[in-house]
């Protein structure tokens, strides 16, 4: 059962929260907390409910995310909770706005990259700025933010700060470990809260995802869920067209489901989208299909994805973080990297953790793909 105030978004009501989640929600306003937990443990849900708690206390909070797709997702949920639509923001948008209000002008950047903010230069300037007004901040997917950002946050000293992070989902070039976040924010070890249970996946999906977990990382594998389901499967299809026909047929047979299609390469993404769209127009015109590509003139609006509603969403790997779908398809898995590096395994860990019910791997090769070798015994070859 989901909260009826949240059309399309599966947001549990307060009475449906677990004991560990309720304990987090009951932490006093004015706390500085670090919450760790793997995919499906409810980190984003807890950020939303704590933001709602602050609103009831007449305190307006801001929830920062790293990518626009997750921002669009949480914006929909926030509006349904009665939170202002501007309560959610990407990290970069917030940083530019905050710098303009604090110092005037654009923030200093490094290497002629507008997204690589020079937080150390900002830290030096903060010594000359009066004390900041009260701020209530939640940071989701905090492992994707640079550690220098947290050092500046420590100087700003928000009135209430909660960081949600999973070290095993660091798939961006600039990132932070759990220990780096804790140290930068001077958070006591006792104020690090760990969420353990997986509320999203079926057990077969969670078992596959766990095979791509990188050992020796502070954020652990979640407790395996009890919910049973179908075994994730690999389908060897001869061409991209056949992969797209497979996806379209599935969507036609399951019109009420939200389906995520993940593509590794950005240059391949429009081909996959156009191929599926063409099949839909020919055979299933009632199915909705959307795509998000950052910076693209036609498909650069994450809000247009209508996250949480039925239909097909075509995304690339970098937009996967924080999302969830009923069913997920990974296309071209036979051309993916072979997970010889931790970054490749982390990406697969993130992708395999997105579906609630069904996970399909599609490729052109008849041989079992090297990219899935870690979970070969858990994946059915159809």
Where on the chain are the PLM-derived regions?
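Conserved helicase motor core of SF1/SF2 NTP-dependent helicases
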Residues: 5-100, 131-132, 136, 143-382
